[in-house]
Amino acid sequence: MSAEAPVLGILCGGGPAPGLNGVIAGATLYALRLGWKVIGFMEGFKYLCTGDVDVVKAHTIDLTYDIVSRIHFQGGTIIQTSRANPRKSTELQENVRKCLRALKVRYFLTIGGDDTASSAVSVAQGMDGNEISVISCPKTIDNDLPLPSDQSTFGFHTARSLGMEIIRNLMVDSKSAPRWFLVEAMGRSAGHLALGMAEASGAHLCLIPEEFKQDEIEFEDVVELVEATILKRLAYGKNYGVCVLAEGLVSKMSKKALYRLFGNREPPTDPHGHILLDDAELARSLSEELLKRLGNLGIRITPKKIGYELRCADPVAFDAVYTRELGYGAIDAFLNGHSAALIVRENGQVKPVQFKDLLDPATGRVRTRLVDVTSQSFKVARVYMWR
């Protein structure tokens, strides 16, 4: 390979999602056919943010045919990921630019959610357009990015499928050793994953933030809905069941409710400023309150979280194909002079969409795709719940 070959740098940011390796493989194999050199930055922006070129080189791998040829079957990511955020300061952004220049990266592919894409674009804005092009492939099991034609984000189908299996087992367990399971499902702002798993498994109740019309909800609002379902089933002689709760309910709670969940302290946040919803222990707090209310009826309640075990599952066929197409689409976009764009799939075609076109003017962040509670799909899911 020529020393003058264009260099493609790839990194993953944010939480894992099934299919990350598929994007890496799809992009790498196509780039190698073009005669490019491909490198992977370990743990996202973590080492790039240091500005230490030697450190970055020590945490960079050459992506070759032998390394990536069969990884699209595998969950996780061979180049690891992190939530390091160069947008925290101009110094961090300049550190990233320094390292990209030192490694002669001409094409920069990031795989992640809106935070990762925003970070990549902010870095590129300080560089000449002929110096580097930036493309992002959107991923999240939350399925909350505003992709065209209601296209799902990659990893969602796999996460929903595995989540369904787990909840289906809990359904059998709840009946065999009578109890209620309160299942807290990942989903920072939207209820797509929780609703998808609940509907597919036939869970008795699912609560998502979108169905609450008020701007803020109280802890008691959620408690009372779950309590009503438990009592309704009890009236039919059924002292067991499964309720799925989107963790995004926490994001919509009032300050009073948040203080209750987080032990009378300010909610902790991640490097991007998002509340650490997992620390709220929503299902556990609800279980404790419901036992106070219903314990005298002999009701048993067990809290359960589903989330981390979904993120690195081997992708189902849909996601394996989808991610390979996204990887191809990223390289095709580079070849056609695109930058500051996301690769999306619409009507069977992969294409670039300018990142700025997906931003919410009010927040400057990528718009969140919420569950449409007026849709037939939501009505179908709801009609089979015990409400």
From Swiss-Prot:
The keyword Metal-binding applies. It comes from the Eukaryota. The record marks 139 as: Important for catalytic activity. Non-allosteric. Keywords: Cytoplasm, Glycolysis, Kinase, Magnesium, Metal-binding, Transferase. One of its GO terms (molecular function) is diphosphate-fructose-6-phosphate 1-phosphotransferase activity. GO terms for biological process: fructose 6-phosphate metabolic process; response to glucose. Diphosphate binds at residue 15. Substrate binds at residues 140-142, 186-188, 247, 308-311. The active site is at residue 142. Pfam families: PFK. Mg(2+) binds at residue 114. Pathway: Carbohydrate degradation; glycolysis; D-glyceraldehyde 3-phosphate and glycerone phosphate from D-glucose: step 3/4. It is found in: Cytoplasm. GO terms for cellular component: cytoplasm. InterPro entries: ATP_PFK, Phosphofructokinase_dom, PKF_sf, PPi-PFK_TM0289. Catalyzes the phosphorylation of D-fructose 6-phosphate, the first committing step of glycolysis. Uses inorganic phosphate (PPi) as phosphoryl donor instead of ATP like common ATP-dependent phosphofructokinases (ATP-PFKs), which renders the reaction reversible, and can thus function both in glycolysis and gluconeogenesis. Consistently, PPi-PFK can replace the enzymes of both the forward (ATP-PFK) and reverse (fructose-bisphosphatase (FBPase)) reactions. Homotetramer. This is Pyrophosphate--fructose 6-phosphate 1-phosphotransferase 3. It comes from Trichomonas vaginalis (strain ATCC PRA-98 / G3).
